[in-house]
Design a protein with these regions (language model features):
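Terminal alpha-helical segments
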Residues: 1-115
Length: 115
């Protein structure tokens, strides 16, 4: 059973609100030097924005990697989304994975500065 247009619009709006909230949180964390938390919030901002885009166009993905893949194939590779934004999303996913590791990794804000 698919979503109605109203349900789809509501879901897109909720995802975009979450993305905006997370990017504001990421900026705050970045200003405090909380690099790992900023990377996490930047990633989830990208993730929810990408999910909103997929939902809007009737596409879906069931995993984080799937979302990145569907987003890349349908929007970055087609030129609908700038490659720099696609690269930023990929970079934030990598940083999220690294910062989720309980072992110290020598993480700094250098990689985030490229955003």
């Amino acid at each position: 059973m698919g979503l109605t247009n109203d349900e789809r619009s509501s879901l897109v709006e909720l995802r975009l609100e979450k993305a905006k909230r997370f990017i504001a949180e990421a900026e705050q964390m970045l200003s405090m030097g909380l690099w790992d938390l900023a990377a996490n919030r930047f990633y989830y901002s990208c993730f929810h924005a990408a999910q909103a885009l997929l939902i809007h166009y009737g596409l879906s993905a069931h995993t984080h990697a799937g979302t990145l893949g569907v987003f890349g194939m349908n929007f970055v590779k087609t030129g609908k989304i700038d490659k720099e934004l696609g690269a930023f999303f990929s970079r934030m996913e990598q940083l999220r994975m690294k910062t989720s590791n309980p072992q110290p990794i020598g993480f700094s804000g250098i990689l985030l500065a490229k955003r």
